[in-house]
Amino acid sequence: MAAVKLEKEVWSSRFAFLMASVGFAVGLGNIWRFPYVAGENGGGAFVVVYLICVLVIGVPVLMAELLIGRRGQSSPPIAVTNIAKENGKSERWKSVGGLGLLAAYTIEIIYSVIVGWVLWYLFKAVTTGFDGVDATIANANFEGMLRDSSIMITATFIGLAITGSVIYAGVQSGIEKAVRFMMPLLFLLLIGLATYNYFTASFYEAMSWLFTPDFSKIDGSTLLAAIGQAFFSIGVAMGGMMAYGAYLPRSVSIGRSAFIIVSADTVVAILAGLVIFPAVFKYGL
């Protein structure tokens, strides 16, 4: 296979690239997994271990993926192939990029369903609201949604259609326009909800559960959990950062960008804990 170079648009600005990259990194690993894993593995002690793993492992891997994408100037498998051929190495290295895409595809199968859940709950919030809904009713409503195949299929299809339309529009007309609106909105929502929780009694209970250090829980399994969380949360090893790197102008610093992406990703994870767990303790979920 001949080396392929993409003739394409690039990110219009460093800010647009950072917003898109943070948007790719932020996901279930931040919103759901990080607060729970931190609380179960020593609270503040786990956070320290996690931050070390992010700086020592996560940032270098992220930099490598962005560099491969920018230098290879193509999709992950072809970008890896281009670089391998430039250095006289086997084209079999393209399997590295292919495995990343396979991982992304597998995760997308899960995410597309969850996006459908979110759209359904957004519809319910606008039409009927959730006044008077306690933990028992909320659980029954959720199980009812899962049993209704028409809701699940329709909501998932709508989510995929929205995502597909954004991607089809391209980098500047699609992804950039979406993230310029959605990412600041995400941060505003998280900050607003965390501020609201600050004035509830359960906020301090959640803070204690999340951040009080318990170094007695730090062992080999905790280290593995921190490394796994770093990879899952930042979004490396899934091909996405390579793909975004392919559209990255050479004037943009990869090292500085990687540090900003990881920092923003970590802030979202911490804010998510301050949003979710005060409600968990308050309502006994």
Language-model-derived ranges and their functions:
Residues E9, G39-E65, I151-M152:
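Extracellular loop-to-transmembrane helix junctions
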Residues A16-C53, E205, G240-G245, R256-F259, ...:
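Transmembrane helix-boundary motif of multi-pass solute transporters/channels
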Residues F17-F24, Y50-L55, G97-E108, L160-A161, ...:
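Hydrophobic alpha-helical transmembrane segments of multi-pass small-molecule transporters/permeases
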Residues Y50-P60, L101-V126, A155-A169, P184-N197, ...:
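Hydrophobic core segments of alpha-helical transmembrane domains in multi-pass membrane transport
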